[in-house]
């Protein structure tokens, strides 16, 4: 029996939820007609970063092909403007701000999804799917108190519904810089144990702060701890030298692991949850992409990301799996340009606009924080088209359960709504509202033409990245139909709309 016992509210007035009270029912029916499902989370990719969304300074032909063969959304949203909470929301179907400890996770964080909760992977596994996760994880590993990377790490992704796990524990700018496969660090020498700490230095490995002469990619802010591959990271580590990744090889390794999972399960329905490291910092493209975009390393890793998507598509083609595979491509949050390294991302933009026409970006309550590229392809069932309806990533869980006619416990995926026909481009009915969350847990709500951002005493500007966070002590209201760039706060002109949306947001919090 699954239940969630540690869901504690972060914000005043937020109702305590119980999550999932019981296991989903096993589907023992025929699997032959069930579609394969691949969900690909790019990292920090903006709606303006792809040529199918209007970018003119960089070309993404593989993703463009995916969009041309599927449903391309223009009003799709991540649940949050940072990585960990967006991933939490997708897999649990619950707004991350309802639970403590769902902010940006350090590399030695405990698993933040309760193993008693029914996840989307649980649901699909019970529906007869082989389930796998490959790539960026960033939801913690191990028990409360921190991760021991030197033995079998448990709980892990296999504890919450995944049959197979090959993951980057956190982000590529955070230690430990190793891969974990089915609970074990890949290539670890037991005579060279790993120690990780996010509070103080451990061991004698050089750091960016103490040994700047050893750094090949200098930090612009924040990244001055243990140096791995000439790149200073967030956090300190020592040991595990034989297990350390090479940054320029990460995309190849993740892509090949994803392809291997597909090949291994080609005869049965499978669910692959794939998290790329691109285009997150540090941006270290493979040599075959380095210098090819004309936009510096950020542009180069966009090309690398596009190659990754092309490899997945080509694998499906070669196995004749394309027609009956639902392939969803999106980003965990909006873009950021300078996120901690002196990689000339600003200087090399050359007119490229990662945020598109939208204000803000990663970390922000403004539109570019959570309005993301979102493409769905299923050739057997879905006709190519453009989708302008409001849609949230949090609704993937309930929508896939509806597609598979898979019953859920009453309290599973409490915030996920079934919008299957919208997801598949068969109708254009919008979600009633979208809730957005920024770095500081400030919430915004979009309904119809209006967007309301609740008052907040948090900083207006993120200290390190200089990103506008959307925080203001006064209510903010924007008419997105007339002002999609959120230039004019019209809260004073429309107090009745402010009151309506404020009350709606409060009702969502306490639901």
From Swiss-Prot:
Family matches, as Pfam families: Sulfatase (PF00884)
Species per Swiss-Prot/TrEMBL record: Bacteroides thetaiotaomicron (strain ATCC 29148 / DSM 2079 / JCM 5827 / CCUG 10774 / NCTC 10582 / VPI-5482 / E50)
GO molecular function: hydrolase activity
Main function: Exosulfatase involved in the degradation of the glycosaminoglycans (GAGs) chondroitin sulfate (CS) and dermatan sulfate (DS). Catalyzes the hydrolysis of the 6-sulfate groups of the N-acetyl-D-galactosamine 6-sulfate units. GAG-specific sulfatases play a key role in the persistence of the major human gut symbiont B.thetaiotaomicron in the host gastrointestinal tract.
Similarity comment: family membership: Belongs to the sulfatase family.
InterPro entries for the chain: Alkaline_phosphatase_core_sf, GAG_Ulvan_Degrading_Sulfatases, Sulfatase_CS, Sulfatase_N
UniProt enzyme class: hydrolase
Keywords: Hydrolase
Name by which UniProt lists this protein: N-acetylgalactosamine-6-O-sulfatase
